[in-house]
Curated annotation (Swiss-Prot):
Acts as a component of the peripheral membrane COG complex that is involved in intra-Golgi protein trafficking. COG is located at the cis-Golgi, and regulates tethering of retrograde intra-Golgi vesicles and possibly a number of other membrane trafficking events. It is found in: Golgi apparatus membrane. Residues 1-27 are annotated as: Disordered. PANTHER family: COMPONENT OF OLIGOMERIC GOLGI COMPLEX 6, CONSERVED OLIGOMERIC GOLGI COMPLEX SUBUNIT 6. It holds the Pfam family COG6_N. The gene is COG6. Residues 16-25 have a biased composition (Polar residues). InterPro entries: COG6, COG6_C, COG6_N. This is Conserved oligomeric Golgi complex subunit 6. GO terms for cellular component: Golgi membrane; Golgi transport complex. It comes from Coccidioides immitis (strain RS).
Length: 732
């Protein structure tokens, strides 16, 4: 490209640029273009300026572009001029306000001077008025205090008359005034806490007199109401109940009223109980459908049950009637008695009884009301039981008494006379039951024939009768509320333990004593086993009976099983003839392990077995034949030996164990016989060799040969061929 020719972008190029390749020198137009191009049109000022120009509706002409700056400056000057005019008006208004404020300050100063002069003139009058108002307020306060004091601490003459005069009735007005007087008496403690206690002492003395007179009036009124009211119905009127609650603040007077009430109710309830025993009533008229309780006197259980049911009904009614006095109305009576205990410390029974228990007081009052009935009940139950000797009925009466003991304990407490009477009756019935059993034992022991065991060796009749009497008792206890869940493995005492000991143990001891009449050991063992089995079978369904007696019975039965095993074992040995052989072989039995391990001595001894009388051919053959004859019917004969035992399972077990012991004995005898034959053969061979070496005579050799031939012909094993395996098969 030539120097001074235009560049491709239209800009002239200089030789210097062409030669050196450097950037051109910035010019004013270049700078302006760079400034325009670098301007960000997102700038808020630029955007606002453009929007303003757009709103003016200017045309983009050359004329407009030349005059735009001048037009804008003219508009700015006009705006500034209008602002200056407006500020001039504001300055004029401020001048007017300043003049008004100055005028107001002058007026305020004049008023201040007038007020100061007026205050100086009225200040003495105001001070005097303030002093008078203060005195008036003090007088009014004292008047209010005096009125309040009189209203709170002083009773009017009419109120005192209502409170203390016996001519005035005891009504709600009386109780209101009494409550106010008690409040006055209590509030006097505040007066006694001040410096001047005279007023408090005088008011307290007067209030104490009024209270004592009021409580005495109330006490006499309640006594009068008790005498005039119908005590057949223990329900008290609301006024009497309220009076008793108030009177409870004087424990001495209160207990005096309750004593009168309890004595009256005791007499009435005793009379009602006697009337129920002799004549049934329904209201004021005779009830033809109801009969006197005495009509069932022939049946002690029903008789006692009817009496207890009547006593329970009367006790429940008495408690419900008296609950309104002690428990209801939010415990007002309890609060009154607690206040009375505080006011009369000497009324406490002991130092610990500082809190009144309404429930306990209720139970004590019910107990006092029912004490006469309890005495009559105790006498009549004792008479009914004393002439009865049926064990089941006696136990059911005991169970019935136990039920009512639990019931009455919840109603009147464990320490009440009624519960104590029933507990005493239970002891009396139990002693009567023991007496009946002692009479039965005396009757049995008095007749010697009654102690002779039966021919079939079954349980004696007196024992079965005792069990027949015991089973209904156990069933009754099992179905009763007294039944405790008893673990079969537990040996703890339960409520039935005294009964079963009283009704069973004497007869069990008597049965054991009667077994001494049997001289035969087998018969005596069978008899004792049958007696134990019949008792065990009877008590087994009842865990509470098993808990105390099954361990003793099981121990005795285990001992008897051992005796039965010995009996069966001896029977098998005796009937098979093996007893003779075992007795003869006893000296040849190894005494110790060391001796049994010595081969020579044992063989020499075993060889001597053939010389025993029991092992001679004739005797051994007889025993072998006796064994063969017995084996086919051995199990049947052994079972028949114990057939009088009333437990096939027990007989079977004893026989099986005896058979096992017999097989062990037979195996021992068999091994001894085989050992004897082997020992004899060894001795025969040893004798022959010794004679040849020593050069003995021929007749001795012949004799030995003859003896050796006899040993072969006379073998113990040949004469006694049975094996242990055969015995086990035949006895299985």
């Amino acid at each position: 490209m030539a120097a001074g020719s235009p560049s491709p972008d239209g800009m002239p190029s200089s030789p210097h640029m062409a030669n050196t390749g450097s950037t051109p020198k910035p010019t004013a137009l270049f700078n302006r273009l760079n400034a325009v191009l670098s301007t960000s049109y997102t700038d808020p000022d630029i955007r606002d300026s453009l929007e303003t120009l757009d709103k003016r509706g200017l045309q983009n002409t050359a004329e407009t572009r030349r005059t735009l700056r001048l037009d804008i400056q003219k508009e700015v000057i006009d705006s500034n001029g209008s602002i200056i005019q407006d500020f001039g008006k504001v300055a004029e208004q401020l001048s007017r306000i300043g003049a008004a404020i100055s005028h107001l300050n002058t007026i305020c100063e004049d008023m201040r001077q007038h007020i100061t002069s007026a205050r100086q003139e009225t200040e003495p009058v105001l001070e005097e008025a303030a002093a008078l108002l203060s005195q008036k307020q003090e007088v009014e306060t004292k008047q209010h205090l005096l009125d309040a004091f009189n209203k709170h601490f002083v009773l009017s003459s009419d109120d005192i008359s209502i409170l203390t005069s016996t001519a005035e009735p005891v009504d709600d007005r009386f109780f209101q005034i009494l409550s106010r007087q008690k409040r006055i008496h209590k509030d006097c403690e505040v007066l006694l806490g001040g410096e001047n206690q005279r007023l408090g002492l005088e008011i307290m003395e007067q209030s104490s007199k009024n209270l004592n007179s009021a409580f005495m009036k109330l006490y006499k009124w309640i006594q009068k109401e008790f005498k005039s009211s119908n005590l057949e119905d223990p329900q008290m009127g609301s006024s009497i109940r309220k009076g008793l609650r108030v009177l409870a603040e004087r424990p001495t007077l209160f207990h005096s009223c309750l004593d009168f009430f309890a004595e009256a109710r005791e007499y009435i309830l005793s009379d009602s109980f006697h009337y129920a025993l002799t004549a049934a009533v329904s209201g004021d008229r005779l009830d033809a459908n109801a009969k006197p309780i005495e009509f069932s006197a022939h049946d002690p259980l029903r008789y006692v049950g009817d009496m207890l049911a009547w006593v329970h009904s009367a006790t429940v009614s008495e408690r419900e009637a008296l609950e309104a006095l002690f428990i209801s109305d939010g415990g007002e009576l309890v609060k009154g008695i607690e206040a009375g205990i505080s006011s009369e410390p000497w009324s406490r029974i002991n130092d610990e009884q500082s809190v009144f228990d309404g429930e306990k007081a209720l139970k004590e009052l019910v107990t006092r009301d029912m004490s006469g009935v309890a005495r009559s009940l105790k006498q009549r139950v004792e008479l009914a039981v004393q002439g009865h000797d049926e064990l089941v009925t006696l136990y059911k009466i005991m169970n019935l008494l136990a039920f009512y003991e639990s019931t009455f304990s919840k109603l009147v407490g464990h320490d009440s006379a009624l519960v104590e009477a029933i507990t005493s009756l239970q002891d009396f019935v139990f002693k009567r039951l023991e007496a009946v059993i002692h009479d039965q034992i005396a009757t049995i022991t008095g007749d010697p024939s009654g102690l002779i065991p039966p021919d079939d060796l079954s349980a004696p009749e007196f024992l079965t009768d005792a069990i027949d009497n015991l089973v209904p008792l156990m069933k009754a206890y099992d179905s009763s509320f007294r039944h405790d869940i008893t673990d079969d493995t537990s040996q703890n005492e339960n409520k039935f333990s005294p009964i079963i000991r009283a009704t069973l143990d004497p007869f069990l001891d008597l049965a054991e004593k009667s077994s001494t009449a049997l001289s035969n050991f087998t018969s005596r063992t069978i008899y004792q086993t049958n007696s134990i089995l019949v008792i065990r079978d009877a008590i087994s369904p009842f865990p509470f009976a098993c808990a105390t007696h099954l361990p003793r019975l099981s121990s005795t039965l285990t001992s008897l099983k051992t005796n039965l095993l010995d009996i069966q074992h001896d029977f098998l040995l005796r009937e098979t003839g093996l007893q003779t052989l075992t007795a003869a072989l006893e000296p040849f039995m190894p005494k110790s392990t060391s001796e049994s391990s010595t081969g020579n001595g044992l063989s020499r001894n075993l060889a001597d077995i053939a010389s025993l009388p029991e092992f001679q051919p004739e005797s051994l053959s007889t025993i072998s034949q006796q064994l063969d004859d017995f084996l086919p019917s051995a199990l049947v004969d052994a079972t028949d030996n114990l057939k009088r035992i009333h437990s096939p399972g027990l007989v079977k077990n004893a026989t099986e164990e005896a058979v096992e012991a017999f097989c062990c004995d037979f195996e021992l005898v068999e091994s001894m016989i085989v050992g004897a034959d082997e020992a004899r053969e060894k001795m025969s061979v040893a004798g022959t060799v010794s004679s040849s070496a020593a050069g003995k005579e021929m007749d001795e050799i012949a004799a030995l040969g003859e003896t050796s031939g006899q040993v072969g012909a006379w073998s113990l094993r040949v004469l006694f061929p049975r094996t242990t395996g055969e015995i086990r098969v035949l006895l299985s």
